Amino acid sequence: MSPDVSSSPSFDRAFCDDLERLFAWPRDVRRFSSCPLPSGALEQLVALTAYAPPVGYSQPSRFVSVCDTARRTAVIDDYERANAEAEATYPNARRATYTALKLAGLREAPVHLAVFVDTATTRGEGLGRRSMPEMLAYSTVLAVHTFWLAARARGIGVGWVSIVDPSVVARVLDVPAAWSLVAYLCVGYPQEEHLDRELSRNGWEDAESAATTLVER
């Protein structure tokens, strides 16, 4: 059911606090249980991405639920190839830390969802893209973020797998040539929850202070 947006909403302090907790809650899940999502849950989450603001109302995001075992296996094979290549680029001490990280839940997650941007869409007639054509892909990034937050609010975990070759994934999934991969997502219920982020917990990187990210001119 669509929310009532007939008037400007008023959000109380409790809602704002809950929203901030959702933002702060680590979202990149790599360890999934085998429990399937409820019927219709994936479709509901994808439908909510329509509320993400696309440039020129282009709505360029395309979602592919990867159900075929052979296609999933091909994506996993490409991930393992790309991961081995990435691992080899680090010096020995850092490589050991990299190897110990769990960077994807491709084998465990009940749902694989590939998210593409349709670069050939005619919706919006190019509004807002002449100077910054990359805004089309950024619109899909916002759709992914909306999906991610909506999923976590429902207790569903999402992991974004970027260690793949986009051209290989597009070929494996047999999508139109104008579709460009933005995100390959693992989706399912988390096997475990943590209040800290996995990369910080395992010594890869700490959070940057917000004071260093805002400047004035």
Where do the PLM segments sit?
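Glycine/small-residue-rich phosphate/adenosyl-binding loop
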Residues: Q59-T140
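N-terminal targeting/leader regions
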Residues: M1-P36, A41-Q44, L48
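Glycine-rich phosphate/pyrophosphate-binding beta-alpha loops
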Residues: Y51-G56
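Generic beta-strand structural signal
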Residues: A109-V111, R154, L181-A183
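Small-aliphatic-rich amphipathic alpha-helix that forms the alpha element of a beta-alpha
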Residues: T49-A50, L113, T119-V172
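C-terminal helix-cap and adjacent tail motif
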Residues: S2-F15, D28-V29, A183-R217
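Conserved hydrophobic/aromatic beta-strand scaffold that supports enzyme active sites
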Residues: L22, H112-A114, Y184-C186
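A glycine-rich helix N-cap at a beta->alpha junction
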Residues: N83-P91, L103, D174-R197
